[in-house]
Amino acid sequence: MKFKEDGIGVSDLLKLIPDELLLDLAAETKVDYQVKKLYGQNVFNLLLYGLLSNERVGLRSLEDFYNSRKFKFLFKLPGTAKSAKYNSLSARLATMNVSYFEKAYQAIYEQCSQLYDEPTLSLKYKITRVDSTMVCQTANKLEQGINVGRKKDGKKQIKYTISLTDMFPSSVEVFTQQNYISENLTIPKAILKVIDKRKDNVFVFDRGVSSREAFCELDKNDCSFVTRLHVDTRHVVLQDLKPAEKPIVRNLTIIKDQMVYLYKTGAKIVEHPFRLIQTTNEKGTKYWFLTNQVDLSSEEIIMIYKHRWDIEVFFRFIKQELNFSHFISVNENGIKILLYMTLILAMLILIYKKINEFGYKTAKRRFAMELEYIIDDYMIEQCGGDPNTHFW
């Protein structure tokens, strides 16, 4: 059953994760080496189904589903143990080869971006928004974590830095060490790891990155970027660029468009040219934009930055609808596995949402319902019945 006959169904999307892919990755990464139960493919299917749950999924609820007739009927592999305890699941998540899930995520991203992605603004370039989000947990539960601020509330935080290329998450980094609280370290690292290496990829991030070394490193690696710069940042003007044909972009008026050198500290100048666009809004508030792109118009630069907000919407989606703020595993290995599985499920739901024209909540709910219909029909057929004779 499909909720939209002219739309896309869950069965179509599940074809993006063929059994052959998971079996090949298991052999490549040796994720099942010396494993007698809880094979990689079992854990993959268990987490994918568990994350669709409306409630906060935990190790005990995963244990219940693993031991259910439905899971055994659908996903049991030869040699799989008949049952599993929550502590066995916890231990397996702590020691599994993360690269199995990382490579699965990368392969599924490639499929999704080739088949379903659409450029946000123009066919001339892709937009990759890069930002970080923090998730906290009580300190005695997390093996590692970051302390933020001076507040001693007994909690630590995990930092996730994610790149969102047009519609899909194209890279991710997990940080648990205190020195990575700075965006000057985390965002460039995530950018350099992006799966989509095309030259027409423009990265956009906020003012959290201010390091001149970070700007230079991105430029030297041919990474086009657009960011905000603190107003009145000291700089040396090298060249005034041609005035914009349309000096008003949305609520901003372009005042200056220049090639500049930026100051570092004191009187030290970083002799690396960047483009600085100065604007003001109707209230006179200043907004400065920095980029290494000279081929795009000032209007395009500003419009690219305005799409940075899309990643905030994505963070809200995975936190509210996919329980991303809830830790199933509290060690770094398990946290990374859950992250990759969350991103895989998010990509499937985003396609389902866009093509069927649903909202986020409706897309997630109907995706889960449609998957249940598929499972029910399959079980009826395997037991010799005809699902079409029933009222659903």
Residue locations for each model-derived region?
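Single, function-defining residue in the core of a domain
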Residues: M1-L59, L123-K124, Q137-N140, K152-W392
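Conformational gate/switch positions in structured elements
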Residues: K82-Y86, S132, R207, V313
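Major-groove recognition helix of helix-turn-helix-like DNA-binding domains
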Residues: F75-V98
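Short, surface-exposed loop/turn segments at secondary-structure junctions
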Residues: L74-G79, F327-N331
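Short, conserved beta-strand segments within well-ordered enzyme catalytic domains
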Residues: L47, E63, S83, S88-S90, ...
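DNA-recognition alpha helix
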Residues: V57-P78
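Active-site-proximal, Lys/Arg-enriched surface segment
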Residues: S90-L164
